[in-house]
Amino acid sequence: MELKDFMDLSKLQKIQNAFSDATGLAAIAVGKNGEYITEGSNFTDFCMKYTRNSTEGNRRCVKCDNECTGTYYCHAGLMDFAIDIMLNGEKVGAVIGGQVLPKDPDEEKFRQVARELSIDEDEYIEALKKVNVRSEEGINASAFLLGDALNNCMDAGYNETYNGRLMQRIKDGIAECKGLMENIEGNTNQLNAIQSQQKMLALN
């Protein structure tokens, strides 16, 4: 089962965009195999233009995306989140994001990260200054609220799809039974006609 099988992706994109606009957090939805299924909302230059644009930075980012859950500090020092979207106990996708600071940054630590990733330090710090600062409590609450909302949408979409398919199977079953009954009736009429002919021949 895949998230996109039971949820309207355009609706998912609107929810994601509204979440990012309201909270200042970045967000994007991924399928169960990690592929992006929506466009990123509120992504920062710090992450996309600099960190992920370096070979080592991208390797570390992908590792975080694939291995981290809940809310966590990414390798570059920002706070991110990854919330699983579940259906009947099975993971069908996730929403990941964050790209915010829980407090004012220590510039020297980020300069060290820039050196490790072979990124221009001054440009990195300028991009860092544009990153939103949110309390850790607010980040946690926002991430899990989005997760709950998407899981509820997922359940509703699944139920709608399942019930629709169930009704279609019932209709198909009724049509099949009707066709079968018509065939039986037709065969019965043929048998009756044959029996009548045989009786007439027997009388002659």
Locate each region found by the language model:
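Structured interaction and signal-relay segments at domain junctions
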Residues: 1-77, 204
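Sensory/regulatory domains in signal-transduction proteins
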Residues: 62-115, 130-153
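A short, charged helix-loop
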Residues: 115-126
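Alpha-helix boundary/capping detector
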Residues: 45-46, 60, 115, 172-179
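Signal-transducing coiled-coil/dimerization helices and immediately adjacent hinge/linker segments
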Residues: 130-204
